[in-house]
Amino acid sequence: MSEFVLQDSRGNTGDRLMFWAKDGAGYTTNLENAQRYTKEQACSQNESRESDLPWPLAYLEALAEWSVDCQYVEPEEVSRELLDATRAHLYASNAWNGNDLVFLTGDGGLTNDLRKAEPFLVTIAVAMAANPVNKVSVIPHLLAVRLARRVIPNGKVKHREALRGTGVILAKPPKYRAPRDRCDHCGVFISDAQRFQDCPKCKGSNAP
């Protein structure tokens, strides 16, 4: 049976999609913690609120990135694990994608995906982080791996492509219809602009 997750499309954290979390725990960017739904359950929720978008779980899993939430990086734990580490990653000290660390790659670029981050020799990483000019911090490789979780960048996924062949039909948001005014004198419908002019039919004034 295909599993689905529900995105709250009203907003992202950085460029990470937000999903309904398991056990009613609000929202999460962590794909592991996203509530699983059957196709029928996902469609039913989308019909109730069109901003809740169903995604096939398998589609997202194939495109997920592994990222580290800065909120779970404890300085004491970093210092302790650096003592025995052989490899470490460097990340920008004052830049985040939502809450996620921005790592350095081997060619001097930046990435949010831990799999693309350069695993520097720990002595080199520590020396670079110690120089304030570099504006980078260090995290041991094994600690980063333990903290990493799968997230979905909105630029890597396409909703129409994901739903192709699933049979899912999205609810259509209700069309907005502007309220129509009537002439205070003869009752004929008038446009918003005509509320401040004489009625085109009876010539009565509708000015406030």
Model-derived regions: residue spans:
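Disulfide-bonded cysteine-rich modules in secreted/extracellular proteins
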Residues: 85-92, 180-186
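Residues immediately within or flanking Cys/His clusters that coordinate Zn2+
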Residues: 176-183, 195-196
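Short Cys/His-rich metal-coordination motifs, predominantly Zn2+-binding knuckles/fingers
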Residues: 183-189, 202-205
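A short, charged, amphipathic alpha-helix used as a generic interaction element across diverse proteins
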Residues: 26-53, 106-142
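Short, mixed-charge low-complexity intrinsically disordered segments
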Residues: 45-74, 126-175
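SH3-family beta-barrel domains
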Residues: 1-8, 158-162
